[in-house]
Amino acid sequence: MNPSQLIVMDDTQALYVRAAEEIAHFASEAICTHGEFTLCLTGGTTPASSYELLATRFHLSVDWKEVQFFWGDERCVPPGDPASNFGMANRTMLSKLALRPEQIHRMRGEDEPAQAAQEYERELRAFFRLEQPGDFPCFNLVLLGLGDNAHVASLFPHHPALHEETRLAVAVEVEAAPSRRISLTMPVINSAERVMFLVSGEKKAAAVRNILQGPADPEQYPGQLVKPRKGEIVWLMDKAAASGLK
């Protein structure tokens, strides 16, 4: 896989800052051009630190009332649970930005997973005005973390959800705790205007190498399936995560 951009920072702190800078830049660009920025958030420690920076150091860099927040996946837990991706984003960023409720489009992790996935699909179809079964939303920016096993969102190796071609969101059950989750599907991710991976730590080095330079095996390395049809991929990582690249 050849990324549109591969950016390697010296350390994690530099990565957090650069990620916040990139998100703020993309947001301002989209708002200037389209009057709105649709941002699909991810969970994890690296995004959390960047979210905190967006709500503090970069608070004045973005017209936040024009940003619509979505999620790439969610653990099936209440929003106040420490494992909740919405809860993390709310604590680190959203609660500090004086947003209107209608700007926040969260997956309802507290509901029954299949029902929550169907409801999220309905919300996406309504917001993006998708009328046909084969239509997919076009987010301005989708943020993705990367699991040690090369999973993205909650699309794990060898999971049937990797092959979903029509639905926008699915309920998945995986071995990693919390085992029940909701995830956007790969066609949604690949319909984005821009996808940005945020990856840090030596534990992710093998996954990064296998996705970017390894043999084609998307069943084993789901990150290889991330190929925006009309958009670009930005890989933003620290030196430790990039240490396996040649």
Predicted regions and their residues:
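Class I SAM-dependent methyltransferase SAM-binding "motif I" and its flanking Rossmann-like core
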Residues: 141-187
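ATP/nucleoside-binding phosphotransfer catalytic cores, i.e., glycine-rich phosphate-binding loops
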Residues: 187, 193-246
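Glycine-rich beta-strand-to-loop/alpha-helix junction loops that act as flexible
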Residues: 41-46, 144-148, 200
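Ligand-binding beta-strand-loop-alpha-helix segment within the catalytic cores
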Residues: 1-3, 63-140
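A short secondary-structure junction signal
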Residues: 117-118, 152-158, 207-211
